[in-house]
Amino acid sequence: KLNRLRPIALENLLVELRKRTFRGKPLQEATVQKYLSVVSAVLSDAKRNEIIQKNPARMIDLPDTAQKAQAIPTDKEAEEFLNIIADIDDPYKTFYALAIYTGCRRGELCALKWSDFIVDGYEGILTISRSRSMVPGKGIVEGSTKNGRSRTIYMSEDMMNILRSYCYDKWQEALNGGFPFSDYLFTNERWELMHPDTFTKYLRRLYDENGFPKEYHLHTLRHYFVSTMLHNGVDKQTVAELAGHGDTG
């Protein structure tokens, strides 16, 4: 039934379309977007006729640059990526680890505070309730998450170990430099909040230096998180809630 169609189902459809080929070549992003436009038009008509209340096609969570394909890394590539970031400096190591372990969006990661984490034995609980993004004419603005709701994600022991190490280093940095410890996770050497683009640009260089596909970007780590959850048998409704997708009701 149309009223049971959710954004995550359409996102999975787009992922499958991008895997298809035409005359030996992958479908162009413009072609994939045309498919989505047709689906959206049908759903808009259904909304006008009060068959559905919302058009899920308009809540699709696309990367920052919609023209780029939503490629998904293999498990081997993900393992290689984790090995690579294990050797880079913070705050980048912790930022990218959180991206792949939690599936958070860039703006959500940039807005994280230490108070958003709760230690639960060797593991942890993370609450995502805000986001930081660039607004033309206003600069970086902090607001609610994309769907306007908070969500909770359980974090593995591996992720918590990375976070503990980062927290210790930040405390040492604050003590040695005479700076007050920031409420926010991701600050530079002057304890200023870092610009979201800084993480995107650094990751692009990291991808290029290590031979990852050109179509990979920061949002690719989020796609890997979602696809891994689905592959491990987590139901789509739960995955949608963990990813903070738009209409999950």
Language model segments and positions:
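Long, amphipathic, Lys/Arg-enriched alpha-helical "connector/arm" segment
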Residues: 8, 65-91, 101-104, 158
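Conserved tyrosine-mediated DNA breakage-rejoining catalytic core shared by Y-recombinases
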Residues: 59-62, 71, 75-77, 112-171
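Active-site/catalytic core of tyrosine-dependent DNA strand-transfer enzymes
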Residues: 131, 156-213
